[in-house]
């Protein structure tokens, strides 16, 4: 009934009707939900194995809220479900897929610290250590690409780029783009200062990391970049994309095409600004990626030549 009543409503909750909950059965053979409404004296337990219906019964719960308990499947020859019970495995999963969800994802973690030194300290004193548990927020929550460019330093952008894309050098250019209207998205793009070792090989994969409201849905979405800008690295986050959209659906998604076109123009304008305002840096960029721009102008029967012509450099005797 809830789904039917709110079918046409703009509900801004990730996975409200599917992926966020039903994906639990991908790793659990049973799911238990215990919930108590604020101001209520009653709590209820819902339990299902994901196949034949569910069981609903009264439960005991001291505080208001909802607990979701996953009964993780046993390991198989092909799947290691124990990874979802491993502390470091959980941290890695949260960092990869939900680092930028705007709500805190917290977990109790076991840590160690040195015990306070006695006073006075005996001559034969040796430091002692103790273990303790601490509730730690695992995700960053506020993505850097949603901040105003004036709020982020060049060093912060460079550190984010090097950490996210495993590069040792600062980017040649940082491109911040956000649009509301026909296509709603935030994008943070980087023009590398050097080409990857495999850039001109068939093994190189172009694409931008694609997020839906802070949740990673594709590590490298090739459809967001034209081939002649395949060197660009970055992230696109859109609230208009479904969390469970498939690769096939993405290729036909009109929002993705709008974002592609907007980013293409933005990248072109930023490169042209670099050429006009920092010729030395642009020439360094050209040595790394100029061949790709020339190929873009030549390929597809010169279809993109008009777009790229202002970015091309040629040797001259003058």
Where are these regions (language model features)?
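A short, contiguous, amphipathic alpha-helix enriched in charged residues
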Residues: 1-6, 150-172, 212, 307-317
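Short flexible coil/turn linkers enriched for glycine and charged/polar residues
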Residues: 7, 50, 61-64, 99-100, ...
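Conserved, well-folded catalytic cores of nucleic-acid-processing
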Residues: 2-5, 27-37, 71, 97-104, ...
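A contiguous, basic/glycine-rich beta-loop/short-helix subdomain that forms a polymer-engagement track
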Residues: 195, 206, 280, 284-318
């Amino acid at each position: 009934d809830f789904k039917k009543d709110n079918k046409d409503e703009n509900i801004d909750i990730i996975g409200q009707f599917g992926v966020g909950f039903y994906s639990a059965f991908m790793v659990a053979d049973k799911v238990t939900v215990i919930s108590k409404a604020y101001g209520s004296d009653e709590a209820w337990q819902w339990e299902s194995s994901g196949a034949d219906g569910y069981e609903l019964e009264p439960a005991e719960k001291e505080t208001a809220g909802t607990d979701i308990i996953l009964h993780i499947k046993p390991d198989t020859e092909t799947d290691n479900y124990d990874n979802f019970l491993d502390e470091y495995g959980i941290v890695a999963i949260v960092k990869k897929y939900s680092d930028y969800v705007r709500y805190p994802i917290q977990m109790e973690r076991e840590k160690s610290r040195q015990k306070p030194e006695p006073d006075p300290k005996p001559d034969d004193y040796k430091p002692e250590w103790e273990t303790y548990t601490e509730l730690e927020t695992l995700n960053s929550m506020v993505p850097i690409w949603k901040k105003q460019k004036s709020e982020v330093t060049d060093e912060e952008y460079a550190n984010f780029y090097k950490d996210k894309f495993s590069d040792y050098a600062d980017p040649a250019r940082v491109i911040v783009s956000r649009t509301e209207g026909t296509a709603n998205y935030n994008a943070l793009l980087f023009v590398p200062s050097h080409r990857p070792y495999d850039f001109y090989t068939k093994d190189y994969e172009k694409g931008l990391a694609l997020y839906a409201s802070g949740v990673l849905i594709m590590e490298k979405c090739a459809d967001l970049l034209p081939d002649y800008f395949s060197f660009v690295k970055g992230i696109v986050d859109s609230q208009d994309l479904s969390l469970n959209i498939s690769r096939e659906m993405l290729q036909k998604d009109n929002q993705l095409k709008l974002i592609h076109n907007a980013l293409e123009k933005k990248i072109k304008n930023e490169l042209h600004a670099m050429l006009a305002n920092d010729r030395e840096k642009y020439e360094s960029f050209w040595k790394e990626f100029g061949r790709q721009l020339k190929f873009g102008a030549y390929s597809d029967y010169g279809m993109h030549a008009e777009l790229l012509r202002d970015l091309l450099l040629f040797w001259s005797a003058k």
